[in-house]
Amino acid sequence: MLAPYPAILSEAEGSFGMSHRERSKRPEGDPSTAVGMTVRSTVTYYALKRVNYCATLYNRRTGFWIPSNMAHFQRIGLLASLDVPEVRDSLNKLEAFLLSQGREVVYEERAAKLVDWPVDKILPLDQFPGAVDLGIVVGGDGSMLSASRSMAASKIPLLGINRGRLGFLTDISPDEIAERVLPVLSGDYKQTNRFILETSITRHGKLIGEGLAVNDIVLHPGQSVRMMAFELYVDGEFVYSQRSDGLIVATPTGSTAYALSAGGPLLCPELDAMVVVPLNPHTLN
């Protein structure tokens, strides 16, 4: 799916980390207090912790969300990042429809640059909590993933209008905005739960990176074309040591993305599990 996924974890550059549950045992020397999965590569520790964020809701006729207990949505925030005519057209159409239904509409800063909208109705993303009941993302799956990661802690629901290619997560057609969005505004949706990976990287006892991932985390040597050696621990228990091109750790949501391309299995989105897929392993001990 689109950037910033998959996150690249490089021993040389150390960008992002990973996620799981709490653990009672750690690999010797592991400074991490997170539980779940640890990947150890020389002096670098990549810790993964499963976060109990509910990650999705589905409209009964399908749509992608981060859950909420609200049955009705009055204040709607519009998000978009792709500066293409199709996105601008859908934003204008969506805005007109929401206003016709008596909803209050605000634009996230990047989306506001694509349309003519009053300055007092523009909000940065970090001010959405408490200001909007529902976020609607116009774009592709990557736009939805980015918004989901940014807004996960706030639990603001997200609905996707597809202006990308695949539309796994943003599967409402621009031609069906009125037909598909109106039932959601009235509370006609079904909630499903998905989790997110919380990630951190520690080197020489110092935290050097952390983040969230809806799809997957990838351990990779970066731009260098070489194999890397590492050990994998789950809940503090040694699983294996490996030399390979890297490792993918994916959520069930992300099992349809990079992990699938690397030969991993497809998981039911609601399954409480993770996919671990080695990239071209040379050894597995």
Regions found by a protein language model. Name each.
Residues 166-245:
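Catalytic core of DAGKc-family lipid kinases
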Residues 12-30, 36-37, 49, 56:
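A cross-taxon signal for low-complexity, glycine/charged-rich
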Residues 53, 65-134, 175-190, 201-211:
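ATP/NTP phosphate-donor binding region
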Residues 237-285:
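Gly/Ser/Thr-rich active-site loops/lids in small-molecule metabolic enzymes
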Residues 151-161, 168:
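Gly/Ser-rich helix-loop-strand patches that form or flank binding pockets
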Residues 104, 155-157, 275:
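Proline-centered loop/turn at the N-terminus of a beta-strand
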Residues 43-46, 50, 55, 62:
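N-terminal, intrinsically disordered charge-dense segments
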Residues 87-88, 142-148, 255-261:
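Short glycine/serine/threonine-rich phosphate/pyrophosphate-binding segments
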